[in-house]
């Protein structure tokens, strides 16, 4: 009996390590937060690309925070109207990556990123993608997804800080330069993600 109890106790100790190490099993950085629809019914607050890049303070999140829950501003929904400058529909995680600027003639690196997850995660995302497709229909799209002529769009969705692209830890002021064409400031890591609705202004 003592041997059996000892074996059970040992098994518990051995299993505790892997379970603790496997608490974060998301397939991509903060994936549950990126596809979540629980905030979709909140009333959106107005925002702009200029305000996001100039006034939204970055949270203390970095690449190591792979499963960090939403907090602070990320618990709010925002509506942004801007000009679609680039659309990338071929991302590893299946999201559509869209770059939005304040004006049609704004520098392309003054963009914010908004992302629409795949239809399989919610019909909302399918509708948002369909509306975006209708907005860019007939536009010339260059290699890499850049639109020859920008198109105006309204975007509604949850704020999200993509700390995966932060260079140097949770308090760094630089990104790794891999966040699309948007500038390398940490504030440019703020996204609207997921996008719940796309509208024609």
Model-derived features with residue positions:
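Aromatic-residue detector
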Residues: 1-2, 97
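OB-fold and OB-like single-stranded nucleic-acid-recognition modules
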Residues: 20-201
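Bacterial N-terminal signal peptides
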Residues: 2-16
């Amino acid at each position: 009996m003592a041997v059996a109890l000892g074996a059970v106790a040992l098994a518990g100790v051995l299993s505790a390590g892997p379970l603790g190490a496997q608490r974060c099993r998301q397939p991509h950085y903060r994936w549950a937060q990126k596809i979540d629809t629980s905030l979709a019914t909140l009333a959106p607050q107005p925002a702009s690309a200029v305000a996001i890049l100039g006034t939204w303070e970055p949270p203390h999140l970095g690449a190591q925070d792979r499963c960090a829950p939403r907090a602070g501003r990320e618990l709010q929904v925002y509506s942004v109207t801007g000009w679609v400058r680039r659309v990338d529909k071929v991302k590893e995680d299946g999201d559509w990556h869209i770059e939005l600027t304040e004006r049609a003639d704004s520098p392309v690196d003054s963009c914010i990123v908004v992302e629409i997850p795949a239809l399989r995660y919610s019909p909302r995302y399918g509708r948002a993608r369909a509306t975006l497709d209708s907005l860019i229909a007939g536009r010339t799209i260059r290699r890499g997804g850049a639109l020859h002529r920008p198109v105006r769009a309204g975007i509604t969705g949850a704020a999200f800080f993509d700390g995966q692209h932060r260079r140097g830890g949770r308090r760094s002021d630089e990104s790794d330069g891999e966040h699309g064409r948007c500038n390398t400031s940490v504030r440019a890591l703020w996204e609207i993600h997921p996008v719940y609705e796309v509208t024609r202004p």
